Amino acid sequence: MKNLFVVGSLHLDVIVKSPRIPQKDETIIGKSVEYVFGGKGGNQALAADQNGASTFLAGRVGSDSFAKLLTAHLQNSSVDFSALQVGTGASGMSVAIVEESGEYSAAVVSGENLHIDEKSIEVPENTGVLLLQNEINDKVNL
C-alpha cells in the first residue's frame, strides 16, 4: 500500500461557546471553552490515519505549552510525525467563538506554521499521495 504524506499546519484551536457572538467593543460571558487539536494539515493526517491510511506528517510547532498538547495528540495516533519541526516561537492556534445556533467567528495565528523549512522535508518512500493546503507558506507547497 502507498503512503499518504501531509505537509501542513498544526493549530491548537481554542473554542469558546457563547450565547452569541459579541459585537464590536463588547465583552460577554462565555459558557464553556475547549482546547482542540487542529490545523488543516493535522486534521487531514488524523482523518487519514483513522481511515486506515499509512500517514506521514511534516509541519512545525513552537516551543510552548501548545506544542506539547499538539504532539501528545499525535502520539495517541499512528501518524508518523518524525518530520515535525520545532521552532522557538509560538505554535499555531485559533480562537473561535461559537454561538448557540452554530454560527461562529474566528481568528487564526499561524505562528511557527509560517516557518516550515521546506528544504529539510524529505518525501517518505512509497508515497502515493501528497496533501497540501493554504495554511502554510506558498513556497512550501511549491
Question: Model segments located where?
Answer:
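Residue-level signature of transmembrane alpha-helix interfaces in integral membrane proteins
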Residues: K24-D25, I29, S94, S110, ...
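Extreme N-terminal leader/targeting regions
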Residues: V61-G62, L74
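Conserved beta-strand edge residues that scaffold enzyme active sites
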Residues: G62-S63, T88-G89
